[in-house]
C-alpha cells in the first residue's frame, strides 16, 4: 500500500501534531514491478515534479529503497522512526538478555545519536556487538542502519515539518485493505483481492466518480 499527500492536505492541531485531510492510495498484492507502475502513475497524476520536495517514508526494506532510487532519484527518503525504535529494542533485548534497563538505555542512546547526527557514535556503539550472532527473526541492526544511514536525520526532518513515522500507512492498511478483505468467513484469490483493493483505493481517494463513469460508459 502506498499513500500520497502534500502539505496542502494537512493542518496542524493545537498540540502541533499534523492531521492529513486527504490521501490518495495505490495498492497491489504481487510483484514489485506492477506496484512500481502504480506508484509512478499516481505520482504523475499528482504532478509530483511541481513540488519543492518529494519525501518518502518507509520501513527501510531493500526493495522499497531500490524502487524509490529508480523512480525518484531526487527524493528524500526517511526511515520510519518507529520501525527503527522497534528494531533497536528487539535487537537490544537479544543482546542484553531481556535486561530492560539496559535495553531502554541502549535504545535511547541510538535514537539520541540519530537526533544529534552523531552517526560515528552509532557505528562505534554497534561495533561492540559485531561478533554476536543475531537470529534471523531479529533485525540485524548494524546492517539495517548501515543501509539506511542517510535516512535518519530526524532533527532536520521534524524541523522541516515532515512526518518521521508511518502511522498513516499503518492505519490506512486497516481502513483501506483489512476492513474490507478480512471480514468473517472471507476467502480471496489474489486476483479477486487485487480487484477489490483497487476499488477500495478509489473509494478512499474520493475518486468513486471515475468508477461510476467506467460502469456507465460500459452499460450505455
Language-model segment annotations:
Residues 1-220:
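Catalytic center-proximal scaffold of phosphoryl-transfer enzymes
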Amino acid at each position: 500500500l502506498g499513500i500520497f499527500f502534500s502539505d496542502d492536505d494537512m493542518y496542524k492541531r493545537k498540540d502541533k501534531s499534523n492531521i492529513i485531510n486527504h490521501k490518495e492510495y495505490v495498492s497491489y498484492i504481487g510483484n514489485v514491478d506492477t506496484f512500481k507502475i502504480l506508484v509512478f502513475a499516481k505520482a504523475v497524476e499528482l504532478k509530483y515534479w511541481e513540488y519543492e520536495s518529494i519525501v518518502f517514508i518507509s520501513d527501510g526494506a531493500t526493495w522499497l529503497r531500490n524502487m524509490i532510487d529508480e523512480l525518484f532519484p531526487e527524493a528524500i527518503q526517511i526511515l520510519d522512526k518507529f520501525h527503527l525504535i522497534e528494531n533497536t529494542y528487539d535487537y537490544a533485548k537479544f543482546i542484553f538478555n531481556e535486561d530492560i534497563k539496559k535495553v531502554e538505555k541502549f535504545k535511547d542512546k541510538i535514537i539520541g545519536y540519530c537526533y544529534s547526527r552523531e552517526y560515528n557514535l552509532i557505528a562505534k556503539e554497534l561495533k561492540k556487538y559485531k561478533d554476536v550472532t543475531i537470529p534471523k527473526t531479529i533485525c540485524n541492526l548494524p546492517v539495517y542502519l548501515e543501509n539506511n544511514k542517510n535516512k535518519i536525520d530526524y532533527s532536520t526532518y521534524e524541523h522541516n515539518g515532515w512526518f518521521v513515522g508511518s502511522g498513516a500507512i499503518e492505519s490506512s492498511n486497516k481502513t483501506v485493505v483489512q476492513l474490507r478483505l478480512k471480514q468473517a468467513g472471507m476467502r480471496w484469490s489474489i486476483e479477486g483481492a487485487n480487484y477489490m483493493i483497487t476499488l477500495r483505493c478509489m473509494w478512499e481517494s474520493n475518486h468513486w466518480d471515475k468508477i461510476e463513469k467506467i460502469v456507465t460508459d460500459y452499460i450505455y
